[in-house]
């Protein structure tokens, strides 16, 4: 990986995401295995000794969403009870009955892995995919979207820098997309491990991704808006209840 190559060559590194997770081998829907970023954080000692820097999780989500959480902590709240990163859109892609606007490979990884949650006094734990259903009314005309718990880097990063009682990430998939993802899992098409197809080794997930339109080519067909933001609940600087959604809309 480029991350390790930079470490070996004493080169600074920046990434928009973090190293992948691996579910707990026996209790995937309740206990953490290898969390997002664990493999990179485990190398911190060597980067420190070499005097080089790696900035990971620095995109919009994660990245800007984490900055929103820290801003709320320092400028808006005296106590934070809950931080929920909420992502939703009303984007449609003209000419396609089904065409994800984001990498289906990554979407499967995020949405079918056990969602990660952090709570004060309990730490990190996992739950079942598509749990915690919540309809959130997104701003700037996007409107209400059905959101569910999803594994995401913010739940690893925010508790390390912000004192909150609970941190979670919810993705606005909508009922139709949730059904599609459940069907993909039921058919085994989410598997990364290769299977033999008439003498050819093929990963079902890679095959699925190759069968769908490349999101990078769909920009001119996309209509609507997408929103990434951080919902913070707690007490303001005067001790009064407050809830704020800090967001970015494209």
What are these regions (language model features)?
Residues 14-15, 56:
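Hydrophobic residues in well-ordered beta-strands that form the structural core
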Residues 26, 66-68, 94-99:
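Short acidic, glycine/serine/threonine-rich loops at helix termini
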Residues 11, 47-54, 243-250:
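Glycine/charged-rich beta-loop-alpha catalytic/anionic-binding loops adjacent to active sites
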Residues 3-9, 16-52:
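Rossmann-fold NAD(P)-binding glycine/threonine-rich loop
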Residues 74-250:
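C-terminal catalytic/substrate-binding lobe primarily of soluble NAD(P)-dependent oxidoreductases
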Residues 31, 55-60, 141-147:
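Flexible, glycine/proline-enriched loop segments at strand-loop-helix junctions
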Residues 35, 39-90:
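Adenosine-phosphate binding glycine-rich loop
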């Amino acid at each position: 990986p480029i991350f390790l190559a930079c470490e070996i060559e004493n080169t600074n590194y920046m990434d928009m995401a973090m190293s992948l997770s691996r579910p707990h081998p026996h209790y995937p829907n309740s206990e953490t295995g290898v969390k997002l970023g664990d493999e990179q954080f485990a190398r911190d000692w060597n980067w420190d000794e070499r005097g080089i820097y790696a900035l990971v999780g620095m995109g919009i989500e994660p990245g800007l969403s984490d900055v929103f959480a820290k801003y709320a902590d320092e400028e808006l709240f005296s106590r934070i009870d809950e931080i929920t990163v909420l992502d939703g859109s009303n984007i449609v892609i003209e000419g396609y009955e089904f065409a994800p606007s984001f990498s289906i490979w990554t979407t499967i990884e995020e949405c079918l892995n056990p969602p990660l949650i952090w709570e004060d006094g309990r730490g990190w734990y996992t739950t079942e995919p598509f749990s915690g259903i919540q309809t959130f009314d997104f701003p700037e005309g996007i409107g209400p979207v059905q959101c569910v718990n999803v594994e995401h880097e913010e739940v690893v990063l925010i508790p390390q820098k912000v004192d909150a009682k609970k941190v979670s990430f919810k993705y606005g998939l909508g009922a139709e997309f949730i059904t599609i993802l459940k069907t993909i899992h039921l058919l085994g098409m989410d598997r990364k491990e290769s299977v033999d197809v008439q003498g050819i080794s093929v990963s079902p997930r890679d095959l699925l991704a190759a069968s769908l339109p490349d999101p990078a080519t769909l920009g001119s067909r996309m209509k609507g808006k997408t929103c990434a933001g951080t919902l913070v609940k707690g007490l303001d600087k005067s001790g009064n209840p407050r809830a704020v959604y800090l967001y970015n809309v494209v």
